[in-house]
Amino acid sequence: MRQIMILLVRFYQRAISPILPDSCCFYPTCSSYMITALEKQGPLLGLLMGLARILRCNPFNRGGVDPVPDKFTLLRNPHPEEYEDEIIARKFHSH
């Protein structure tokens, strides 16, 4: 079930997302967050975390770095600064 859900998100990333304007206010993007949440938490909790993240992604939220926490939560990662340097380094040095 987890792999099917990940395949659906990857389909969205490759077929649908490129034709839409950029709108995610977070890093990683909501679709990448969903995949990581599914991998870390399994299909049910991962889906709930991903949907909660999508609901947080709106013009009234400041956005920013919000990696998937190691423990299940429907709230924003309480300590994104712990990951920020690692994420920024990965983003700019992976090319």
Curated annotation (Swiss-Prot):
Pfam families: YidD
Keyword Membrane set for record: yes
Location (main, coarse): membrane
Location of the protein in the cell: Cell membrane
Protein origin, superkingdom: Bacteria
GO cellular component, one term: plasma membrane
Keyword Ribonucleoprotein among UniProt keywords: no
Disulfide bonds: none
Keyword set, alphabetical order: Cell membrane, Membrane
Function: Could be involved in insertion of integral membrane proteins into the membrane.
Protein family (similarity comment): Belongs to the UPF0161 family.
Stated name of the protein: Putative membrane protein insertion efficiency factor
Organism: Lactobacillus delbrueckii subsp. bulgaricus (strain ATCC 11842 / DSM 20081 / BCRC 10696 / JCM 1002 / NBRC 13953 / NCIMB 11778 / NCTC 12712 / WDCM 00102 / Lb 14)
Origin organism lineage: Bacteria, Bacillati, Bacillota, Bacilli, Lactobacillales
